[in-house]
UniProtKB/Swiss-Prot annotation:
This is Hemolymph 65 kDa lectin BG05. The gene is BG05. GO terms for molecular function: carbohydrate binding. The lineage of its organism: Eukaryota, Metazoa, Spiralia, Lophotrochozoa, Mollusca. Hemolymph. Keywords: Lectin, Secreted.
Amino acid sequence: LEIADLAQYVVDLTAR
């Protein structure tokens, strides 16, 4: 697990 993966996940959610 990398922080970048979590960041990308959060960005995807907030980008909706």
